[in-house]
Curated annotation (Swiss-Prot):
Belongs to the class I-like SAM-binding methyltransferase superfamily. RNA M5U methyltransferase family. TrmA subfamily. It is an enzyme of class 2 (transferase). The active site is at C318 (nucleophile), E352 (proton acceptor). Disulfide bonds: none annotated. It comes from Neisseria meningitidis serogroup C / serotype 2a (strain ATCC 700532 / DSM 15464 / FAM18). This is tRNA/tmRNA (uracil-C(5))-methyltransferase. InterPro entries: MeTrfase_TrmA_AS (IPR030390), SAM-dependent_MTases_sf (IPR029063), TrmA_MeTrfase (IPR011869), U5_MeTrfase_fam (IPR010280). Pfam families: tRNA_U5-meth_tr. Dual-specificity methyltransferase that catalyzes the formation of 5-methyluridine at position 54 (m5U54) in all tRNAs, and that of position 341 (m5U341) in tmRNA (transfer-mRNA).
Amino acid sequence: MSDYTQQLQDKKDHLKTLFAGLDVPEWEVYESPDKHYRMRAEFRIWHEGGEMFYAMFEKGQKAGGASLIRCDRFEAASEAVNRLMPELIAVAAQSAELRNRWYAVEFLSTLSGEMLVTMIYHKRLDNEWMQAAQALQQQLDISVIGRSRGQKIVLKQDYVTETLKVGNRDFRYRQIEGSFTQPNAAVCQKMLEWACGAAEGLDGDLLELYCGNGNFTLPLSEKFERVLATEISKTSVSAAQWNIEANRIGNIKIARLSAEEFTEAYTGKREFKRLKDGGIALTDYAFSTIFVDPPRAGIDEETLKLVSQFDNIIYISCNPETLRTNLDTLAETHTVERAALFDQFPFTHHIESGVLLKKKILGKSKR
């Protein structure tokens, strides 16, 4: 058994143990490539004896020479990132403006090879730096952002445009520097396919909480009459709106509300001007399904009460422990019809998973 296969089996075994006692079907397992799967990567820039190189540090140890790991290549990162790494360091090394006090770098790439590089400094960035960075940007055919304390200099653009294939359709996504995106694009496509499969035949309208840049929203919109998606981050809402227009989708509306705020609006506890200004009347919707992709902390108690009211729940989780806690509550009203493990983060302990729940009929399981 290969190292990759073994670590994936270990994750599946962990889920089986964690969810023991709950009526969960066999876990569907979606593999990742074993290398070049990360579209994002971050490194410190280490300066030593006139040399400059990429570095990471041993987990749990203080950043410094004793815990230093030199990274001339990084197998987990996309091939585009690996190709660019030596070129970027070589070009930057030739310029004092680019080299001096360069502290860290962040790469954001796409499946097509588009590249955004954020160069982080411990100095004020001036016109001389901008001129040098523009020359580097042109030479390497990338987009560059310069960051320092209190400064963000965007030389061309602060985003990349990713294309993900779901079924027979390509979806374009604007992914903005510093905002959340799924780092493993290959597995992300599998997650989108799975979610669309879980939604097959559910019909009606869809409510989505924590929609981000519309990663799941866009393909799921093909499975429902209308979609109302909520997200609190202004940056993510802006990206989601661009993505909706770029993909010419006409049945999605975005509400800039947190999950907690939406719960208050849905239950009639509060009215929100943001909903009215967006032309959103909750009474117009006939929701059959709710889709949730919460942060690591899981779904809070009040929002969980809201979620439990829906006939169908599609729940994507980045933390199986909080998923288990939430399912202990949801299992009182729903049965788990499907369960999936997505290996979004190979060779780490992190597990991404998904479940489809359907409301029990007369207290009996549908399964």
